[in-house]
Amino acid sequence: MAPQMQILSEELIQPSSPTPQTLKTHKLSHLDQVLLTCHIPIILFYPNQLDSNLDRAQRSENLKRSLSTVLTQFYPLAGRININSSVDCNDSGVPFLEARVHSQLSEAIKNVAIDELNQYLPFQPYPGGEESGLKKDIPLAVKISCFECGGTAIGVCISHKIADALSLATFLNSWTATCQEETDIVQPNFDLGSHHFPPMESIPAPEFLPDENIVMKRFVFDKEKLEALKAQLASSATEVKNSSRVQIVIAVIWKQFIDVTRAKFDTKNKLVAAQAVNLRSRMNPPFPQSAMGNIATMAYAVAEEDKDFSDLVGPLKTSLAKIDDEHVKELQKGVTYLDYEAEPQELFSFSSWCRLGFYDLDFGWGKPVSVCTTTVPMKNLVYLMDTRNEDGMEAWISMAEDEMSMLSSDFLSLLDTDFSN
């Protein structure tokens, strides 16, 4: 049962200094334009640190003050999105909600009920909720929820129209550094995306059509299981021996998707894994990692042979290698991955949030004990995230409810059952 929550206040946090007239309009890139209209949600759970002298009111004031300060650099986040073309950087402000939770933090993060996590967010991030249609123009919103034990949940929704996961991490790192009054704060760059990937005229935003009967579960691969999977590749072809742990976990889950799809449907379509790829380091010259926006594309791998997960690692690596200079040049001409996704196929999508540093986000009262996202109403979608100690990996898998129950016992045996839910 979801804990009772009481909203205490709601206000708009504006930049501490007005945005100059020369920066009043932020153009979307065409990589932004082709993204579905939704928000990326993240929730950070912080325990009550006994050595912290800050009470709830002081923490709240520090968060609001530092947010106002950092918005002078992240000024589009305080504006409003114009349909699918630009952001009006008018300093309207970031919705900032405060709530009291009538339960303990330990109860909230133990055996997490993923469907109940939305209550820690400022609003429903995906279409389908009662209020979701009213928030499309808001780039950023924050909700602070305080537990009876003194613990805190910080829920953030950032519009996918102007940010990818790395952009979210860049903003949160700058916010935490500002909150602690650090001097070495990462400066964002909002211009590179639209300059190198110019917007297209009259391009409609793809409509987010929620799938029905979708469930999301969190599965955890601990360090030992990841090492065992890597050892299984030792006898494989040379090109897959040095695969990353992300590629290995994607291959393992893709194999499950393939088996479930074949068991349920008699399909002749291609079985395709789509991996989100950060383009910043693949640009020539490379973009700084602080470049804001959706500086990303998708790499597509087709399953030719799939007797074992090791057969799928090679195609995954090959698809990533194809995201080279020539591919980027095609993207700059306006060619997008949507052209590929229009082909008949069974598509399984993967996005890695690993190594983005979410467990290092410290506002001045310690690091989070849990980092979560929420249910995405879209089937065959996977988010990969670090575990708290960063030596394991969480897979947040979204599937049709009946298909989730078809995951094999071999797959389930790979997981840390103390954390899967």
Curated annotation (Swiss-Prot):
<keyword id="KW-0017">Alkaloid metabolism</keyword>
<dbReference type="GO" id="GO:0016491">
    <property type="term" value="F:oxidoreductase activity"/>
</dbReference>
<keyword id="KW-0808">Transferase</keyword>
<feature type="active site" description="Proton acceptor">
    <location>
        <position position="362"/>
    </location>
</feature>
<dbReference type="GO" id="GO:0009820">
    <property type="term" value="P:alkaloid metabolic process"/>
</dbReference>
<dbReference type="Pfam" id="PF02458">
    <property type="entry name" value="Transferase"/>
</dbReference>
<feature type="region of interest" description="Disordered">
    <location>
        <begin position="1"/>
        <end position="21"/>
    </location>
</feature>
<dbReference type="InterPro" id="IPR023213">
    <property type="entry name" value="CAT-like_dom_sf"/>
</dbReference>
<keyword id="KW-0012">Acyltransferase</keyword>
<feature type="active site" description="Proton acceptor">
    <location>
        <position position="160"/>
    </location>
</feature>
<comment type="similarity">
    <text>Belongs to the plant acyltransferase family.</text>
</comment>
<comment type="pathway">
    <text>Alkaloid biosynthesis.</text>
</comment>
<dbReference type="GO" id="GO:0016747">
    <property type="term" value="F:acyltransferase activity, transferring groups other than amino-acyl groups"/>
</dbReference>
<comment type="subunit">
    <text>Monomer.</text>
</comment>
<comment type="function">
    <text>Component of iboga and aspidosperma monoterpenoid indole alkaloids (MIAs, e.g. tabersonine and catharanthine) biosynthesis pathway from 19E-geissoschizine. Acetyltransferase that catalyzes the formation of O-acetylstemmadenine from stemmadenine.</text>
</comment>
<protein>
    <recommendedName>
        <fullName>Stemmadenine O-acetyltransferase</fullName>
        <ecNumber>2.3.1.323</ecNumber>
    </recommendedName>
</protein>
